[in-house]
UniProtKB/Swiss-Prot annotation:
The lineage of its organism: Bacteria, Bacillati, Cyanobacteriota, Cyanophyceae, Nostocales. Monomer and homodimer. Part of the essential Sec protein translocation apparatus which comprises SecA, SecYEG and auxiliary proteins SecDF. Other proteins may also be involved. It holds the Pfam family SecA_DEAD. Keywords: ATP-binding, Cell inner membrane, Cell membrane, Cytoplasm, Membrane, Nucleotide-binding, Protein transport, Thylakoid, Translocase, Translocation, Transport. Its EC number is 7.4.2.8. ATP binds at residues 83, 101-105, 491. GO terms for cellular component: cell envelope Sec protein transport complex; cytosol; plasma membrane-derived thylakoid membrane. PROSITE patterns: SECA, SECA_MOTOR_DEAD. Part of the Sec protein translocase complex. Interacts with the SecYEG preprotein conducting channel. Has a central role in coupling the hydrolysis of ATP to the transfer of proteins into and across the cell membrane, serving as an ATP-driven molecular motor driving the stepwise translocation of polypeptide chains across the membrane. Probably participates in protein translocation into and across both the cytoplasmic and thylakoid membranes in cyanobacterial cells. HAMAP family: SecA. It catalyses: ATP + H2O + cellular proteinSide 1 = ADP + phosphate + cellular proteinSide 2. The gene is secA. This is Protein translocase subunit SecA.
Length: 930
């Protein structure tokens, strides 16, 4: 009712931006007639206008019109009005909700171009290396055409490559890389090692996945700590003998375990110890982790074992996360459970959450298909508004009502039947599953029924073919099973993706003849000259595969190439070999040539022109088939998406649904659920158990009930609230750390940039002297009773060069005079020390100052992080004593921080006065942290 009276706030907001769109459209004709050179010249013109005092908003309409025209010329894509609207919203620092297939990637070019004109740099953030690389190659062409530099950060890059890429006007990078680089920069020991510029503006693609789903996971850089591996092995054996419910209880919701009294007794007896918590020989931590590993972390669901290593599977995207490890000894406990080599445990050196990382940007915008469900969170934590952008074409997707089964087995059989029916009809099907294990179970059922299908999950052999499988998922009768398709980045095009197939065919012929043999490393991420890039589309890692063939599965191509097309392709590749040399390019550079050949950007390279002609011809031949098939699939109802379990968040369910019915295509979705699904079991509780009894139906008969659907949605809302509270708590606690982190990193940066740190060290020394005076002199006592001899001894402890000082020198002075006298003495002593040191090597004292300050900051900050962790755990228990844990954490954390700052000062003063370099060798100015 209120909406009717006040109007929809979203519509009001869109209306406010409408004049921009009108103005951009009016400029379109004028800009269309410009030559390529004149269009490129606009960039310099805009920069001059900004220098003369115009604002970004003043030049927005013309800048957006220029990007639209550049996109049309280079990519053959013209931004629709709704995409322009999305661009304006991103530029104004909001979140734009745009449905799947509405061209979010193209929208990002608008605000990133406009904000890059300031010269301060723009980051376009994606969820994985493959997408960052794809966007930098694809959308980067628009920016390069307009004269801006485009950078790309990939996980395998060296610091100097990172530095070069962050210097670019627009840098494509994943959220984790930008976070780890920020932390590493704040551990650098010289400015030359710092890779990032100060943050300015970023556009986050799939913003909900990064700012909401990943917000519970802090980024951590860690160093190794030695811990006895046999303790993990013993604890794993004990966990096997302990019985659930008798010796321990499992809290699935909080993902925690609690030992019962019997459990403690049993574990202590088996280990032959009297107390699991004995500080001299602690066992509790190992035993708890071993039980968690047994009960809460399941193989092929939470992790897979590959090449003798435990590799985490991301619960949101279903991708493997090689190199990431669970902390606090949990990963080691799982390694012990799986009988693989146990890697050393780690200690946190630096950490930040994504929430606080992205709050460091003065302005940020984000895009996603599903943000409205988390609108409150975006506004509370990030102060970001969500604006829904209308779709360009009317949506024709049909969301069918859920089918709920009593038993899980009945549900899977029904899904297999539905796949078979759709396959018969010739409709493509996409099934989203929540784990590797479930996807393989369904695959087995379909194999038994003889239904051809593709499987896409975290297993390495499937990862490699990811883009290839997705390109096929829209073909007639195709059945694709995928673990969490969230944010997969490759669109499912009905009838098949002819562009991608043509690109694969080009790679198949070109790569084996051009790639340098030594460069074919198993992971396909060798460093290369030229454009710094990472994983090629559809590349991955296949253990034991030493020689790459680049051959795609033959059934991926819709038809045999004509003789003419094949001839054209062979000639283009022969010409490339003549020009570049046989097997002469690094793999990534070769991937790059294929990528550019498959685009429309102007090029002067004759090899790319020839490859492009061949590519166009192949694409045209494939298109004849795919376009007929497209019409056929559309007439049969389009893509059918099956969800096999409700996710923790309605948003991820909506992302899965959003794969169907893109850009006005028809499509349908349906969720198949069972009363044994995790969500219902953990959060639906007893009500559902009661319902199960009430429904006296067969296992494979679907139940449709309003009460059940409401129960389901209630459970999902409960989960969302539960996780929102966790994220809010993570945020509130990290907020305390964040203020401390900013202070310490700012101090560190001052030291890194400071040319002359002598004054800073002297300030430290003076402050230390003041603290000694305040400690030993009680102003309430008469001066005869002051402990001047102890005071002088303490001063000499810090500054041995003042060994001649006597307490009698201070006898007739007041407190402020003593302080002034000590300040003077400490300065003289420091000059003396400097003269001694610089005799050994001129300028050595300056290097020593920087080294000691950084080393103390790093070492004490590292210890402080551990103290704060311990404090956080202990304040949690105070909640029982009617005290607010957060307030306790804030006040005690602040005390710890002040203590640390004092200790840094004192340690630096002490270390510098005690510093006795040996003649000859130069002091190494690198801290122990790196």
């Amino acid at each position: 009712m209120l909406k009717l009276l006040l109007g929809d706030p979203n519509a009001r907001k869109l209306k406010k931006y409408q004049p921009y769109i009108t103005e951009i459209n009016l400029l379109e004709e004028d800009i269309k007639v410009l030559s390529d050179e004149d269009l490129k010249g606009k960039t310099a013109e805009f920069k001059q206008r900004l220098a003369k005092g115009e604002t970004l908003d003043d030049i927005l309409p013309e800048a957006f019109a220029v990007v639209r025209e550049a996109g049309r010329r280079v990519l053959g894509l013209r931004h629709f009005d709704v995409q322009m609207l999305g661009g304006v919203i991103l530029h104004s620092g909001q979140i734009a909700e745009m449905k799947t297939g509405e061209g979010k990637t193209l929208v990002a070019t608008l605000p990133s171009y406009l904000n890059a004109l300031t010269g301060k740099g723009v980051h376009v953030i994606t969820v994985n290396d493959y997408l960052a690389r794809r966007d930098a190659e694809w959308m980067g062409q628009v920016h390069r055409f307009l004269g801006l530099s485009v950078g790309l950060i990939q996980s395998s890059m060296t610091p100097s490559e990172r530095q070069k890429n962050y210097e670019c006007d627009i840098t494509y990078v994943t959220n984790s890389e930008v976070g780890f680089d920020y932390l590493r920069d704040n551990m650098a020991t010289s400015m030359a090692d710092v890779v990032q510029r100060p943050f300015n503006y970023c556009v986050i693609d799939e913003v909900d996945s990064i700012l909401v789903d990943e917000a519970r996971t802090p980024l951590i850089i860690s160093g190794q700590v030695e811990r006895p591996t046999e303790k993990y092995v013993q604890a794993a054996e004990i966990a096997l003998t302990l019985q659930k419910d008798e010796h321990y209880e499992v809290d699935e919701k909080a993902r925690n375990v609690l030992l019962t009294d019997e459990g403690f007794a049993q574990a202590e007896e088996l280990l032959g110890v009297t107390d699991l918590f004995d500080p001299e020989d602690p066992w509790a931590h190992f035993v708890f982790n071993a039980i968690k590993a047994k009960e809460l972390f399941l193989k092929d669901v939470n992790y897979i074992v590959r090449n003798g290593e435990v590799v985490i599977v991301d619960e949101f995207t279903g991708r493997v996360l090689p190199g990431r490890r669970w902390s606090d000894g949990l990963h080691q406990a799982i390694e012990a459970k799986e009988h693989v080599d146990i890697q050393p445990e780690t200690q946190t050196l630096a950490t930040i959450t994504y929430q606080n990382l992205f709050l460091l940007y003065p302005k940020l915008g984000g895009m996603t298909g599903t943000a409205k469900t988390e609108e409150a969170e975006f506004e509370r934590i990030y102060k970001l508004e969500v604006t829904i952008i209308p779709t360009n074409r009317i949506r024709r997707r049909e969301d069918l009502s859920d089918l709920v089964f009593k038993k899980e087995i009945g549900k899977w059989q029904a899904i297999a039947r539905e796949c078979a029916e759709m396959h018969e009809l010739g409709r493509p099907v996409l099934v989203g599953t929540t784990s590797v294990e479930k996807s393989e179970y369904l695959s087995q059922l379909l194999r038994e029924q003889g239904i051809p299908h593709e499987l896409l999950n975290a297993r390495p052999e499937n990862v490699e073919r990811e883009a290839e499988i997705v390109a096929q998922a829209g073909r007639r009768g195709a059945v694709t099973i995928a673990t969490n398709m969230a944010g997969r980045g490759t669109d499912i095009i009905l009838g098949g993706n002819s562009e991608y197939m043509a690109r694969l065919k080009l790679r198949e012929y070109f790569m084996p003849r051009i790639v340098r043999p030594d460069d074919e490393d198993v992971f396909g991420v060798q460093r290369a000259a030229g454009l710094p890039t990472g994983h090629g589309a559809g590349q991955g890692f296949v253990p034991g595969k030493k020689v790459k063939t680049w051959k795609a599965s033959p059934e991926i191509f819709p038809t045999q190439l004509s003789k003419e097309a094949e001839q054209l392709l062979k000639e283009a590749v022969d010409f490339a070999v003549r020009e570049y040399g046989d097997r002469s390019l690094p793999e990534l550079e070769a991937e790059d040539k294929v990528a550019v050949a498959a685009e429309k950007a102007p090029t002067n390279d004759p090899v790319i022109q020839k490859l492009r002609d061949a590519y166009k011809r192949i694409k045209q031949e494939y298109e004849e088939f795919t376009s007929t098939e497209h019409d056929e699939v559309v007439s049969r109802g389009g893509l059918h998406v099956i969800g096999t379990e409700r996710h923790e968040s309605r948003r991820i369910d909506n992302q899965l649904r959003g794969r169907a019915g893109r850009q006005g295509d028809p499509g349908s979705t349906r969720f198949f659920l069972s009363l044994e699904d995790n969500l219902l079991r953990i959060f639906g509780g007893d009500r559902v158990a009661g319902l199960m009894e009430a429904f006296n139906v067969e296992d494979d008969m679907p139940i449709e009930s309003g009460m059940l659907t409401r129960s389901l949605e209630g459970a999902q809302r409960k989960v969302e609230t539960y996780y929102y509270d966790i994220r809010k708590q993570v945020f509130e606690y990290d907020e305390v750390m964040n203020n401390q982190r900013r202070a310490i990193y700012a101090e560190r940066r001052r030291v890194l940039e400071g040319q002359d740190l002598k004054e800073q060290v002297i300030k430290y020394a003076e402050k230390t002297m003041d603290e000694i005076v305040d400690y030993y002199i009680n102003v309430d006592l008469p001066s005869e009773e002051w402990e001047l001899d102890k005071l002088v001894d303490k001063v000499k402890e810090f500054v041995y060069l003042l060994s001649d000082m006597q307490a009698s020198q201070l006898e007739d002075m007041g407190v402020s005079e003593i302080k002034a006298f000590l300040h003077e003495q400490v300065r003289i002593a420091y000059d003396l020390k400097e003269a001694q040191i610089d005799q050994i090597q001129p300028g050595l004292m300056r290097q020593a100052e920087r080294f000691f300050i950084l080393q103390r900051i790093d070492t004490l900050w590292r210890e402080h992080l551990q103290q704060m962790d311990a404090l956080r755990e202990s304040v949690g228990l105070r909640g029982y004593g009617q005290k607010d844990p957060l307030i306790e954490y804030k006040s005690e954390g602040y005390e710890l921080f002040l203590d640390m700052m004092v200790n840094i000062r004192r340690d630096v003063v002490y270390s510098l006065f005690m510093f006795q370099p040996q003649p000859q060798p130069v002091v190494q100015t690198s801290s122990e942290m790196v």
